[in-house]
Amino acid sequence: MKRTIIMMLDSFGVGAATDAESFGDVGSDTFGSIAKACAEGRADIGREGPLKLPNLSKLGLALAAKESTGTFAPGFSDDVEVIGAYGHADELSTGKDTPSGHWEMAGVPVLYEWGYFSDLTNSFPKELTDKILARAGLDGYLGNCHASGTAILEELGEEHMRTGKPIFYTSADSVFQIACHEESFGLENLYNLCIIAREELEPYNIGRVIARAFVGTGPSDFARTGNRRDYAVEPPSKTVLDKMKAAGGEVISVGKIADIYANCGITQKVKATGLEALFDATLEQVKAAGDKSIVFTNFVDFDSHYGHRRDIAGYAKALEYFDSRLPEIFEILGEDDLLLLTADHGCDPSWKGTDHTRERVPVLAYGAGLKAGSLGRRNSFADIGQSIASYFKLEPMEYGESFIK
């Protein structure tokens, strides 16, 4: 029985990419920065001491990161029995965003430029916002700027509740985000507004519209909920997920995977929010999955809760929790199963600003008869998609080189 389990540690980069200078990200290193802070006692909130990731280390994480940066992350060494194949990958895609990373990993790099709203204030064209408001029957909106998702709730959340005006904001990514209160504005109203925005944004080539639902009564207790929804454009060509589905296989999305691929190539969607629930759902789906199945989970909290918020201790604690549960996955893998762990970009919590960082990502592979040892530097995330295609004997992808022969 052949199955692939993909665990996407959203934003878990392992050192600046070859082209990081073009993005202002030379020196960024999500894993290394977290390990360094832990080793220096600067991440002892909710946890303490050096970063402890014994199971990821067994899969080759520390060695993959060393091959990427040239040095071991503080607290890590080669004093571990590695059971998996490990490497690191550069990105071909032009952006350091979520869709680009995910699509490239599935064999379809984004080689064109996304549209962006680059102005930090008055970010959106009036023509665009006027059309959105007219179609939605709204008399105004708030925001119109680059912002942190939590900071803008503190700043504008009360005014939004008082006026009923949605909050529009963006970031360095190709994204249009809409924040609305679940109760005072209504969740379905938010989703419908996002659908309108998605349609009106087509000429601007924006990658995603994101519904940012929140609850609370004031700045002190406003909190985003698990009812986030991403409205992405479709990948420009067929991903390995599409090819798997077309061949009669199952592709099970856990978390926000289906949204990122605009539901293309997905046969089943499982909703879960938070690291614990996402891991639980992954285990359940792996146990239930039959032959010719892909179970694909995005662990978004690493990015949204800790990377963007520049919370080093929180990121470290989340990594240690994730690591502690990996044996549960190991225990239920079949002899022919392929386990893949990777990331879609970096988001160094020690870095300036709140945006993603252009980094290499880990490529950790276990099972399916793979020999333990180095896979070296991969020239594209697409090597993962090509390897999945090879594993399932699907039609080869246009991009990528398989590490499964």
From Swiss-Prot:
Describe cofactor binding as the record notes it.
Answer: Binds 2 manganese ions.
Biological process terms from the Gene Ontology for this record are:
2-deoxyribose 1-phosphate catabolic process; 5-phosphoribose 1-diphosphate biosynthetic process; metabolic compound salvage; nucleotide metabolic process
**Binding positions (Mn(2+) 1):** 10, 344-345
Q: What is its main location?
A: cytoplasm
This entry's Gene Ontology molecular function terms read: magnesium ion binding; manganese ion binding; phosphopentomutase activity
Tell me if Nucleotide-binding is a UniProt keyword of this record: no
The record's section on CDD domains has:
PPM
Cellular component GO terms held in the UniProt record: cytosol
Record-annotated residues binding Mn(2+) 2?
303, 308, 356
Tell me which UniProt keywords the record has, alphabetically.
Answer: Cytoplasm, Isomerase, Manganese, Metal-binding
Q: In which pathway does it act?
A: Carbohydrate degradation; 2-deoxy-D-ribose 1-phosphate degradation; D-glyceraldehyde 3-phosphate and acetaldehyde from 2-deoxy-alpha-D-ribose 1-phosphate: step 1/2
Question: Which InterPro entries is this protein grouped with?
Answer: Alkaline_phosphatase_core_sf, DeoB, Metalloenzyme, Phosphopentomutase_DeoB_cap_sf
Protein name (Swiss-Prot/TrEMBL): Phosphopentomutase
